[in-house]
């Protein structure tokens, strides 16, 4: 089978899902493709360029949310954040991949459409860009914690797994009260907490917009 950029990226994404970002290497990728490692550099000048392409492929494959003509900006913001989160969760270490890569020029048209949606709603271009960046970074940071917790759970010893989180925070009444409801869910990284934080951000944006009118 001929080796081209698309095949390299597809195999790199598959390898990422198997071994994680820390163990993803051009050597392992070359072995997977049945080629010598230098052959990869005909297509990508270094590993960073390869990861940029893998990130773009991940977004193209899973992040299908796009602003629609006449769509309400609040509705879009919620849908977009949820789509980014599900995309990052669909790939092992997806958040770490996105956090360490640069957007490609192929993504600029989508970004322009997002900014136009916010500008049409009444935000300035710089405010619109700030919203887009803030939402993305909130989601990436949240998923970093989600995926990091999964990795920690795999590494925890039996003794650690059996520790009582409420007993550990018992000397701190406010912390105990705040965590009590989450203990029943088994984790602080829940859909409920994600949605609560997202709502706080969106409501803050709405307040800013009302102040401009």
Residue ranges and their predicted role:
Residues 55, 85-113, 144-148, 175-180:
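Amphipathic alpha-helical segments used for helix-helix packing
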């Amino acid at each position: 089978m001929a080796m081209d950029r698309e095949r390299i990226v597809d195999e790199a994404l598959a390898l990422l899902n198997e071994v994680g970002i820390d163990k993803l290497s051009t050597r392992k990728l070359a072995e997977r493709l049945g080629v010598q490692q230098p052959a990869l550099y005909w297509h990508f000048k270094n590993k960073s360029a390869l990861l940029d392409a893998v990130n773009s492929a991940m977004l193209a494959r899973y992040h299908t949310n796009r602003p629609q003509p006449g769509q309400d900006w609040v509705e879009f913001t919620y849908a977009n954040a949820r789509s980014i989160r599900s995309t990052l969760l669909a790939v092992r270490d997806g958040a770490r991949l996105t956090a360490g890569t640069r957007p490609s020029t192929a993504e600029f048209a989508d970004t322009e459409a997002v900014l136009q949606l916010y500008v049409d709603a009444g935000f300035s271009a710089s405010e619109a860009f700030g919203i887009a960046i803030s939402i993305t970074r909130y989601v990436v940071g949240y998923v970093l914690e989600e995926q990091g917790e999964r990795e920690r759970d795999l590494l925890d010893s039996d003794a650690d797994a059996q520790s009582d989180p409420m007993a550990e925070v018992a000397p701190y009444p406010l912390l105990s009260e705040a965590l009590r409801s989450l203990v029943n869910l088994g984790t602080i990284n829940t859909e409920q907490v994600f949605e609560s934080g997202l709502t706080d951000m969106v409501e803050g944006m709405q307040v800013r917009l009302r102040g401009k009118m």
